[in-house]
């Protein structure tokens, strides 16, 4: 049976990549596409927007009125919009792949509450490679973390509105959890002026925003005389789109629960 997927933010960079990925994947179809109220793209053919030709799926405005047209919704938009979409899907019993970043604590609580009614995959990054890196970071932290300085450097395109990236924060959280630290108290997100010596238990973050960088993350485990670097560089958003489609297939038969790509890829059994 073909899985019907809906995409919100269909006219954005990520939305178009998602449409392409769904079109190319087996066992799924794009059955609904949505854009924000007042968008000039409403009424357009989603396939033509994504550059794959006419597919007969019209970009619409109202998610609520068209929720019966999809089985799983993929959302890579903004926190305020994503929470509205999530509430609609929870009311309609539709599972969600959530790739939006930048949620505050209240937003994260709303996601957890919705997961009591529907299945949700919530991940900061849907790249298979990045999620493998998360696992490698845990192993490196276990071996080196208490004996070295840890720094996370991330770079993205000039249009990204949040910093550090959700992926960088997830990397920090994986490391902090492994070391028994709290990222809220051990994370250092800005250094300026006379900062004093670096504390050994800090987890530092550095952010770069430039041009059209898709996404690059490098983590240093730096000791005196040697440094281990674990890095991931994305050259195309298609890697994120393909991962999201893979997650949509995985979540299709789940009744409820909050999951991430570790669950989708079964990384805990590596």
Swiss-Prot record:
Q: Name one GO molecular function term.
A: NAD binding
Q: InterPro entries under this entry? A: DapB_C (IPR022663), DapB_N (IPR000846), DapB_N_CS (IPR022664), DHDPR_bac (IPR023940), NAD(P)-bd_dom_sf (IPR036291)
- EC main class here is oxidoreductase
Name the domain of life this protein comes from.
Bacteria
Question: Sorted alphabetically, which PROSITE patterns does this protein's record hold?
Answer: DAPB
Functional pathway: Amino-acid biosynthesis; L-lysine biosynthesis via DAP pathway; (S)-tetrahydrodipicolinate from L-aspartate: step 4/4
**Subcellular locations according to the entry:** Cytoplasm
Q: Which SUPFAM superfamilies match?
A: Glyceraldehyde-3-phosphate dehydrogenase-like, C-terminal domain, NAD(P)-binding Rossmann-fold domains
Q: Which GO terms describe its cellular component?
A: cytosol
Give the UniProt keywords, A-Z.
Answer: Amino-acid biosynthesis, Cytoplasm, Diaminopimelate biosynthesis, Lysine biosynthesis, NAD, NADP, Oxidoreductase
Q: What is its main location?
A: cytoplasm
Q: Quote the record's binding site residues for NAD(+).
A: 9-14, 35, 99-101, 123-126
Residues annotated as catalytic? 156, 160
User: EC number(s) of the enzyme?
Assistant: 1.17.1.8
**Catalytic function, reaction form:** (S)-2,3,4,5-tetrahydrodipicolinate + NAD(+) + H2O = (2S,4S)-4-hydroxy-2,3,4,5-tetrahydrodipicolinate + NADH + H(+); (S)-2,3,4,5-tetrahydrodipicolinate + NADP(+) + H2O = (2S,4S)-4-hydroxy-2,3,4,5-tetrahydrodipicolinate + NADPH + H(+)
User: Which family is annotated?
Assistant: Belongs to the DapB family.
Q: What is this protein called?
A: 4-hydroxy-tetrahydrodipicolinate reductase
């Amino acid at each position: 049976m073909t899985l019907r997927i809906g995409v919100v933010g269909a006219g954005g960079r990520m939305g178009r990549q998602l449409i392409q990925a769904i079109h190319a994947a087996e066992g799924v179809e794009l059955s609904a596409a949505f854009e924000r109220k007042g968008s000039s793209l409403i009424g357009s053919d989603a396939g033509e927007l994504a550059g794959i030709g006419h597919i007969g799926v019209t970009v619409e405005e109202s998610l609520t009125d068209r929720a019966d047209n999809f089985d799983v919704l993929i959302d890579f938009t903004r926190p305020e919009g994503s929470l509205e979409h999530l509430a609609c899907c929870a009311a309609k019993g539709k599972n969600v792949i959530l790739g939006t970043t930048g949620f505050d604590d209240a937003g994260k609580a709303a996601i957890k509450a919705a997961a009591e009614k529907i299945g949700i995959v919530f991940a900061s990054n849907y790249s298979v490679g990045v999620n493998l890196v998360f696992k490698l970071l845990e192993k490196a932290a276990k071996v080196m973390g208490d004996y070295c300085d840890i720094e996370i450097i991330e770079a993205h395109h000039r249009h990204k509105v949040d910093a550090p990236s959700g992926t960088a924060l997830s990397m920090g959280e994986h490391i902090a959890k492994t070391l028994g630290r709290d990222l809220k108290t051990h994370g250092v997100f800005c250094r300026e002026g006379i900062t004093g010596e670096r504390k050994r238990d800090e987890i530092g973050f550095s952010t770069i925003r430039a041009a059209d960088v898709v996404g690059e993350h490098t983590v240093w485990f730096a000791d005196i005389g040697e440094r281990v670097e674990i890095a991931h560089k994305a050259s195309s958003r298609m890697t994120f789109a393909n991962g999201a489609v893979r997650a949509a297939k995985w979540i299709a038969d789940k009744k409820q629960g909050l999951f991430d790509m570790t669950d989708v890829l079964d990384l805990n059994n590596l």
